[in-house]
Amino acid sequence: SFKLPNLFRRLFGEGAMNSAFIPVISGIKSKFGKNKSDEFFSLIFSSLLIFLLILLIIAEIFMPFIVKLIAPGFTDDSNKFILTVDLSRLTFPFVFFICLTSLAGAYLNTLGRFAAMALTPIILNLTIIFCLLIFLRTNDKVIVSNYLSLSISVAGFIQLSWIIFSLKRSSINLKFLSFQNPAFKNRKKEIKNFLILLAPAIIGNGAYQINLLIDMILASTLPDGSISYLYFADRVNQLPLGVLGIAISTALLPILSQHVKERNVIEANASISESIKFGIYFSVPALVGIFLLSNQIISFLFLRGEFSLEDTKLTSFALTALCFGLPAFILIKILVVPFFANEDTKTPIKVSVFSMLLNLILNLILIKEFLHVGLAIATSVSAWVNALILF
């Protein structure tokens, strides 16, 4: 149930919003000053709020159809399908909150204030942990699942509240502006540039996440537990990816955008080179560590309750396959930044679409022999192809 809103979080919160928004607003700030950049931020925030509200209403109404699309294998079990629909309806409001939070965080990053957005994942984790502690002794799994799903949306609300508070602390003047406001006409060109960048940024930055979604769809047709094995393996793999890849790209984009606006080619190239070196130096040891200790890591994190030794083994196999793509996943996060800083949307999207098609082909070939592990192998191979072409 958390897979769909979590996909939105990773697509928007971990790259796309930064890639589309920062180059545009950096240009406005450089040319016209902070007051005008605040105004443009308010325009985009107001527009996104209305769009997300409409999306939320539509998604809540048509959630059964959405679940059929992302988990077609669940339709064979009516109880599992109904439960997934109910839980997805509770978690989906998180999408509304996290997309607005990501936009506000991108603006704070432009101003060099990274701490506020960096703390938002902690809010999500603490809210979930708090909910689990409350229902620790509750035996009814359905009740626990419902409240746990609801806690995700509550966490999203707290995250948005925190980031708006951070905006005020940074003296950013956020206003809700209607479409009749003259500012919409005055900034028509910049709004168009942002929208032109956003769709390619989602695909360019989110190839890994979209590939994982495809993996999950195919995994729903495999034996019970296959989706969970991939999900838990991805959660472990996300730790170094989040700490390194996302952190580096988040810090690099505002700096690189500024260098591009100032036409400082030497400094721009130096920033890119240092980021690539840093990513490789830390991702390769992480790969080796996860490969050698995958079973021990999964055992330590998950081997309790209904998570059996067999589950541990099958999850560790998926983690081993995914970890081989770790340096590539991190390099992609870094390598797409120069393209978006230069407002080049075509190259990343072409490479990402090619890698997604390759991933799908490999999935269909490997799933028969290696089941869920074959899906993880396909994701890693396609990531390396993506990174090498971008390089």
Locate predicted features.
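Membrane-embedded alpha-helical bundles of multi-pass transporters/translocases
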Residues: 1-391
